[in-house]
């Protein structure tokens, strides 16, 4: 299914109930989950404490029928929720209409149990395109650059020095990976 899968939370819950009753599998189109940098990050990451995300782009009139949260930030919300396995305690949201009649810049702060925080900013009004995620945890830092397909890891060693490791990934066909995952899920070979 394309995002947003429904126009309201109640419709989404209803669709989920219908799918479960009919034993129908559906998957929401979140391509970034199939980004090799995110997959590598998930294999390396333990107990994130703070996540900072920026998804900024130059104005493009192609997507002005939807606000910046549903157009851009939705990808980052999905990734953050897949990285943090804790209950949400509080969500704070701020957004502004700048050029269009819908929200063009938004900031969301999600507070989880155990003082884990994610701060997400999305804007479709910028002088440059930027898509970065920074993850802070005890004795380590990860940085994902979605545009260059690069993951960097900074780890504190036992002697209090730091080691930086970079992982560069080739551009991959995330849509193809997502479709393969869906097919394998339907055949019971993978979990979606």
Outline where the language-model segments fall:
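Short, conserved glycine- and acidic-residue-centered signature motifs
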Residues: 8, 69, 73, 175
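Beta-strand-loop-alpha-helix segment that lines the small-molecule cofactor/substrate pocket
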Residues: 1-30
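Predominantly a Rossmann-like dinucleotide-binding segment in NAD(P)-dependent oxidoreductases
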Residues: 25, 32-99
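A short glycine-threonine-serine/GTX helix/turn-capping micro-motif
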Residues: 64-70, 164-173
